């Protein structure tokens, strides 16, 4: 069968399926997501650089943790000249609020209550994505945004299909061995590690 769970590479399987069904030789894995430019402009509150922080995720074992995001923000010398969109769901609302309380609402906004159709406009307005593997990272990379994905128990295939995807994994870990059962310690990815990866984009 084409789709089987064991050793499944999601992107390659979907690519093969699409090529077969549409009878085409090469199906690109980069796409284009269109937005309403007027809706995007209406969201612009200031001229600060915009960063999406993907603090939410599908489960606790894939999250880097709100305290790490607070420390990362403070690591930037110019963080008061950056606006952070905190991408998360209702379950992470409290984590988002803790970040806002620490950093200040003039530099943070939670997207916990936004629809996906609205979230894509916030991403379009932003410069880069930093965060957990989440739907936001997939949308961001397909909108041409540099994405820095913190991988703790996410297989390689989830960040293997776009030139905009940049992986951050714990030192000494082979990305080919990371699976949904890896449950790597979030604190093995240091603040400095993430900062050094993204600083040239800030």
Question: Regions from the language model: what does each represent?
Answer:
Residues 1-202:
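Catalytic machinery of carbohydrate-active enzymes
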């Amino acid at each position: 069968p084409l789709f089987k769970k064991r050793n499944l590479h999601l992107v390659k399987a979907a690519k093969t399926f699409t090529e077969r069904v549409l009878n085409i030789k090469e199906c690109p894995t980069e796409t284009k997501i269109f937005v309403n430019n007027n809706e995007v402009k209406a969201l612009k509150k200031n001229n600060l650089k915009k960063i999406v922080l993907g603090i939410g995720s599908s489960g606790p074992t894939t999250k880097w943790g709100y305290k790490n995001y607070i420390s990362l923000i403070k690591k930037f010398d110019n963080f008061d000249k950056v606006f952070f969109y905190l991408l998360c769901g209702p379950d992470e609302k409290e984590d988002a609020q803790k970040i806002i309380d620490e950093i200040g609402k003039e530099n943070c906004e939670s997207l916990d209550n936004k629809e996906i159709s609205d979230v894509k406009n916030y991403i379009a307005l932003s410069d880069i994505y930093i965060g957990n593997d989440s739907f936001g990272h997939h949308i961001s990379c397909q909108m041409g945004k540099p994405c820095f994905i913190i991988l703790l128990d996410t297989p390689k295939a989830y960040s293997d299909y776009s030139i905009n995807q940049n992986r951050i994994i714990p030192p000494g870990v082979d990305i080919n061995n990371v699976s949904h059962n890896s449950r790597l310690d979030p604190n093995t990815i240091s603040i400095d590690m993430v900062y050094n990866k993204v600083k040239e984009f800030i």
